[in-house]
Amino acid sequence: MYADRLAELHASPKQGVIVLAGGGARALAQLLGAPGASGTLLEASVPYSASALKDFLGQAPLSSVSGETARSMAAVAFQRANALDPHAAERNFGLSITAALTTNRARRGADRAYIALHCQQVSYLRSIEFTQPEQKPEDDAPSGTRDQQEAVLCHEILGLLSQHMDIEWPDAKFSVAYESRTDSVQAPLDWQQVMVKARDSNQSGSAGKCLFPGAFNPVHQGHLLMKTIAEQLTGLTVNFELSIHNVDKPCLDYFSIKDRTQQLRAHGNTVLTNAPTFIEKARIFPNATFVIGIDTLLRIDQVQYYGSDSLRDAALAELTALGIQFLVFGRLNEGAFLDLDQVEISASLAARCKMVPETVFRQDISSTTLRANASQAADATRPGRP
């Protein structure tokens, strides 16, 4: 059915890494079964279990089957493609599929799938929901057999890949009803350059005097109050810093970058970097003051992020040599509010820190909690099987 189009796909100079979870095996088989597959596929991965997906992403997702998870998977796959062929970043892509298809066990939510593709120039997300025919209350609400759903998924995966490669993909009719929607974010040139590390940051100079690094997912009142207090204490304009890569978190795609920069726009300027660690941030912005929570400060001092005591000590010494300062805000931890007096950190790091008193700032709120609450609310309202 797809032989001619598969030949066109494999003739394209674009290549990438594909990762599947919960569905999409038929599309991968179609790609591998056509001559020339090595021209398109650098690697394929199937992190099927929850623990395998956590290992692939670097952290457990709030939901294994969601647009956000698919996009994170595609972003990680793109970085993997760049690691496999670092000289082909302009041609590389990461393609992901996460799906909850018809199964023989009870499952919450409708049968659905998400296909994401991320590359240097653009991020795509295709959302698919299998719809149920009208039925009597006593019917068990089928939305197609798994084989029928896999046929749809195969068509949609190859269709999105064809769209990315500017190849026309044929329409097809299926015996199962479904709805499909495709969204995309085209990246401006400065985002693209930071994404592939052609630039350290999309801004420099005065933008780096006082920086507030974070994931900002989502932005909340605590972030805004920290910024206001930091500006009052330092006399400097505080700029938000958003890194495409983050320690212990999946890398960002363009949907995430757009969403978070738009959230932050009303509250100040955002500097985009590809600097997950503070030593990398410091090399880009020497003599900067970083606005951080005490939980972040503790991570800066932890040996596990460096590999050895000597490497950690060398990094802290370099922070000192680069003139880095930290303005530290306390945070609730296991029922207690932590500040510098209650933690033990390296003397050289402590010497670079100024603590904001609890009487000046205390906000017992976190983006993690807000995301979890939002995910639970979404699950509670999702139609489909109990």
Regions of interest found by a model, annotated:
Residues Y2-A3, E8, Q30-G33, S51, ...:
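Nucleotidyltransferase catalytic core that binds NTPs
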Residues D4, G22-R26, E68, S72, ...:
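Conserved active-site and cofactor/substrate-binding residues in soluble primary-metabolism enzymes
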Residues A11:
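Hard-cation-handling environments
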Residues K14-V17, G268-N269:
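Short active-site oxyanion
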Residues V17-S66:
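Glycine-rich, small/polar surface segments that engage phosphate groups of diverse ligands
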Residues F56-A83, I257-L272:
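Short, structured active-site "lid" loops
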